[in-house]
Amino acid sequence: MSRFGHVELEDMPDDLRARVGAVAEKSGFVPNVFRALARRPAELRAFLDYHDALMDSDDGLSRAERELVVVATSGANHCTYCIVAHGAILRIRTKDPEIADRVASNPWGVELSARERAIVDLALLVATDSASLTEADLDAARDAGLSDDEIWDVGAITALFAMSNRLAHLTALRPNPEFFLMGRLPRA
């Protein structure tokens, strides 16, 4: 599951056990990322706080658009864990069983709306060559309808998942088997 071991839910500090337990209750399993990061509780708390501030916001980008950023950039970063886990969430949020695979495997060629294309293009630029970012790139995002706060969110989500992708590589984090079918088949 992780080359550095993991912590079971019942062995997590009380606050993390409650927080991760709520996710497990909703999904039916404990995502491996929480079990792996729980070996360093202060870091897991900081990660969850920033993750939730970015990914659970109802302002600006939709929750599906936020997941689109994660899947596209995790694909560019070759992060299997995040592609699989967030691909499941993207499939559920969009009710499209194919979108995550299409975005992760070929984000440049997948058919998207103009707004989604601008989000993916900006996220990929930040993920792969942020030093080359210009005002023209930001103007292209604005022209597609993104506000400055939404542009910020694209960059912040990309940055958070750059860290997450690299930790997943370092730890050899494996996706939970449950993620692979989520959003592909009707719920039982």
Where are the model-predicted features located?
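Hydrophobic alpha-helical segments
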Residues: M1-A188
